[in-house]
Amino acid sequence: MNNILSEEVLNVTDFTTSRQLTLWKREDLQSSQLDDVAEEVPVALVYNGISHVVMMASPKDLTHFAMGFSLSEGIIDSPREIYGMDVVPSCNGLEVQIDLSSRRFMGLKARRRALAGRTGCGVCGVEQLNDIGKPVQPLPFSQTFNLGNLDRALKHLNDFQPTSKLTGCTHAAAWVMPSGELAGGHEDVGRHVALDKLLGRRAMEGEEWRQGAALVSSRASYEMVQKSAMCGVEILFAVSAATTLAVEVAERCNLTLVGFCKPGRATIYTHPQRLIAD
């Protein structure tokens, strides 16, 4: 398998679509004009020929999404357990066909569940309340971050949201280096998918992305915390608030959770010992 999209797939993965819409302004009469609308398509993750999950997502960076989802959902422990990926068109959307190691595939089949794909829904299809939440090993305390460098990251987060600038419809997730520089980022109509894309990219980048923190443009739900912890991320910054369950999970797994990140301020919910305040 390879990671190169065919021409046919590239033709359907434009990130926006122009549509004729009706615009209303208080001072004007209604008028019709073209405007940009964010693309949202069903994306099936198919492991060794068996469809495991269908999620609604932006049709871009799908191999990163597949890698991040596989890691954050505990399907694999290492990128080496995926031997290859292909993105191919299907009748109603796209498929990421994943060549998974035999050992991991057996484990996946043993706990396979059907997820009904809704935009960025992290618990869709969970059959019982007891299935919510995965056991996460407590994180080490090997990272620190100077909060004085957070403003730099926030200033450039929009650089990784070109579709949001056109449509106002996407979330972003970016990797913040200790200096505050953004090493890279991804956007998607679903906040969980954007984070999975980032986590997959981080795993594939290797040692260069070991140090630092994740920054998301959305709120921090418990799924965002859990996905980060499953991938070894020790610090999660969110532009918006955190939920009570997110705080509980972060406390339990030793993740430093920070919300309401704005220039010159932030709310630290858990494990502030990783943060340096200059």
From Swiss-Prot:
Q: Kindly list the biological process annotations in GO that this record carries.
A: Mo-molybdopterin cofactor biosynthetic process
Which Gene3D superfamilies does the entry mention? 3.10.20.10, Cytidine Deaminase, domain 2 (3.40.140.10)
Cited SUPFAM superfamilies: Cytidine deaminase-like (SSF53927)
Source domain of life is: Bacteria
Keywords, in A-Z order: Cytoplasm, Molybdenum cofactor biosynthesis
Residues binding Mo-bis(molybdopterin guanine dinucleotide), per UniProt: 260-265
InterPro entries assigned to the protein according to its UniProt record, in alphabetical order: Cytidine_deaminase-like, FdhD
A Pfam match is: FdhD-NarQ
Mention one GO molecular function.
sulfur carrier activity
GO-annotated cellular components = cytoplasm
Instruction: Look up keyword Transcription and say if it applies.
Output: no
Question: Coiled-coil region(s) at which residues?
Answer: none
So what does this one do? Required for formate dehydrogenase (FDH) activity. Acts as a sulfur carrier protein that transfers sulfur from IscS to the molybdenum cofactor prior to its insertion into FDH.
> What family is reported?
Belongs to the FdhD family.
Q: What is this protein called?
A: Sulfur carrier protein FdhD
Question: Which gene underlies this protein?
Answer: fdhD
